UniProtKB/Swiss-Prot annotation:
GO biological process: regulation of DNA-templated transcription
Protein name: Myb family transcription factor PHL6
Gene3D superfamilies (alphabetical): Homeodomain-like
Motif (LHEQLE): 347-352
Taxon lineage: Eukaryota, Viridiplantae, Streptophyta, Embryophyta, Tracheophyta
HTH myb-type domain ranges (all copies): 238-298
Region (Disordered): 49-72, 301-327, 376-449
Compositionally biased intervals (Polar residues): 381-410
Length: 449
């Protein structure tokens, strides 16, 4: 679209070429404004930030040239379409007074020029060509002013440029004004260009072409500069790195290269790139992938270490808990055994007490039997004594004697040993009583006689 706009512009401007050819030499010879010095006074190997960079085959191509001056070996300046505006001097002065309070005065021109020069970035626009055009004095002055090629001058890229010698400072200010208008830049007194990156992202639309009438050839007008870059600069291309998808095959070759270089710690992006030898692979791709590979390699190891540490801690905790449980179980077992021993001792003591009680009971039983036998014996003796005391008369006495004699004469059956023993004891107890009775009986019989 931009190339088409340029072609249309050149077609429109070619119509005004014939009218301005006569005035071009006069304008170039009499209008070497301080802009020429402002643009060309640059150190060697410095380039201006405003250069049209398109393919050489496109129409309307403007190329810088090498300067032939003795003080400067090389300088690149504006190569753009410069033309006069249809606005009047009063309107431009009002416009400059209102919208450009920051533009420098003629006395402080050198300070502003140095400030603008410091803001130029040589890495944004490149390419210098040394084609020169053959012409007269006006053509050589024009080429020194704009560093244009012969083809550019012949094609009519420079049209309707004219101003008087009294408007040097005003033309300088107007040039800066239209430069800022075209680029939509806020050029401050320190020559800062904060919106320079936006120029290369979205190209600006082509400006309408204004032509200067013959009556306005000597009137100081405003200049507009068309600055558009169709190709991104190397700096912006370096900043906008191309993304690349790592396929499994690329990753395998990357891993092999890293292994050959003795691991990811010793491997460098440059060496890995040389070993891989893949087209389109840059050192930035290798560097980022190497960093990711290092992170991916060390993260699982750290996780495994953490897992092992956690497992060891768990094992230690389990072993401690098991040891504590075993100790508690052993203590409980010892306490249970001790209690069992105490219970057994108590049982033995109870058995001994029972045995002693049984012995005592047996002794008491024997003693009671003896007492019962003695009571029986005493009962028999009392009964026999009561019978003897209660006998009725004396007649009965001889009968009793006879009976006793008969009893004594009659044989008696043998008594058992126990009865004999009891009788012997009874006899022993009763013998003194019998004697007393017999004595009493005998005394009673003697007085009767």
């Amino acid at each position: 679209m931009y190339i088409k706009a340029i072609m249309n512009r050149h077609r429109l401007l070619s119509a005004a070429t014939d009218e301005c050819n006569k005035k071009l030499g006069q304008a170039c010879s009499s209008s070497l404004s301080p802009v020429h010095n402002f643009l060309n006074v640059q150190p060697e190997h410095r380039k201006t930030p405003f250069i049209r960079s398109q393919s050489p085959d496109s129409p309307g191509q403007l190329w810088p040239k090498n300067s032939s001056q003795s003080t400067f070996s090389r300088s690149s300046t504006f190569c753009t379409n410069l033309y006069l505006s249809s606005s009047s001097t009063s309107e431009t002065q009002k416009h400059l007074g209102n919208s450009l309070p920051f533009l420098p005065d003629p006395s402080s021109y050198t300070h502003s020029a140095s400030g603008v020069e410091s803001a130029r970035s040589p890495s944004i626009f490149t390419e210098d060509l040394g084609n020169q055009c053959d012409g007269g004095n006006s053509g050589s002055l024009l080429k020194d002013f704009l560093n244009l090629s012969g083809d550019a001058c012949s094609d009519g890229d420079f049209h309707d440029f004219g101003c008087s010698n009294d408007s040097y400072c005003l033309s300088d200010q107007m040039e800066l004004q239209f430069l800022s208008d075209e680029l939509e830049l806020a050029i401050t007194d320190r020559a800062e260009t904060p919106r320079l990156d936006e120029i290369y992202e979205t190209p600006l639309a082509s400006n309408p072409v204004t032509r200067l009438s013959p009556s306005q050839s000597c009137v100081p007008g405003a200049m507009s500069v068309d600055v558009v870059s169709s190709h991104p600069s190397p700096g912006s291309a370096a900043n906008q790195k191309s993304r690349m998808r790592w396929t499994p095959e690329l990753h395998e070759s990357f891993v092999k290269a890293v292994i050959k270089l003795e691991g990811p710690e010793k491997a460098t992006p440059k060496a890995v790139k040389k070993l891989m030898n893949v087209e389109g692979l840059t050192i930035y791709h290798v560097k980022s992938h190497l960093q990711k590979y290092r992170l991916a390699k060390y993260m699982p190891e750290k996780k495994e270490e953490k897992r092992t540490d956690n497992s060891e801690e768990k094992k230690l905790a389990l072993s401690k808990s098991e040891a504590d449980e075993k100790k508690k179980g052993a203590i409980q077992l010892t306490e249970a055994l001790r209690m069992q021993m105490e219970v057994q001792k108590q049982l033995h003591e109870q058995l001994e007490v029972q045995r002693v009680l049984q012995l005592r009971i047996e002794e008491h039983a024997k003693y009671l039997e003896k007492m019962l036998e003695e009571q029986r014996k005493t009962g028999r003796w009392i009964s026999s004594s009561s019978q003897t005391v209660l006998s009725p008369s004396d007649d009965s006495i001889p009968d009793s004697q006879n009976m006793s004699k008969t009893k004594a004469s009659s044989p008696q059956p043998p008594l058992p040993a126990e009865n004999k023993a009891s009788e012997t004891e009874d006899d022993k107890c009763e013998s003194p009583q019998k004697r007393r009775r017999l004595e009493n009986i005998a005394e009673s019989e003697d007085p009767k006689r």
